């Protein structure tokens, strides 16, 4: 696999790139569907929840807090606003559990970061500011990164803003992430390079058509990353 050249900054996504996140959300959703089983089957609950999440994104953004509000809103709708307060409290507790994720680094992450310490390493992730900073501290990885930027969404505009903040040309920045839609495509669009590291589970909002590109490499394990530089 051809190596990248003239890279000064390596930006890492956080959730499902540095640590596991989506599997915890999926587990909460399964337990949520059990609570709502008197009102609808699991597929209906999940489909309606996704619709509520999507409609709330412009106001609430991403992350555990936004997800919790969507859980409650969807539950009230599906139950015809008849759900017992005790069940609403159970749902709130489920959502709050996502704010206490262990953020244990995925296998190979620490080794890859150690091998890349000669580069300027940054975190570029979307979500809720306090939640993401808290997870980074719990992960024990914060010492590897000179900059952390949390955005409401990853777009060409926010990617260019990151480059301006870091005072780096897009062509000298490499993005590493698990979401083709959020991590890879916007960076390629502005002239940066990218390494795609798919995770075993992906939130359906992140599903998109993938494509080949001369500035893109795909690896199956983040431990393979240092060999590309």
Protein language model regions, located:
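Conserved acidic, metal-coordinating active-site core of Asp-based
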Residues: 95-97, 118, 168
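A metal-dependent, Asp-based hydrolase signature
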Residues: 38, 50-97
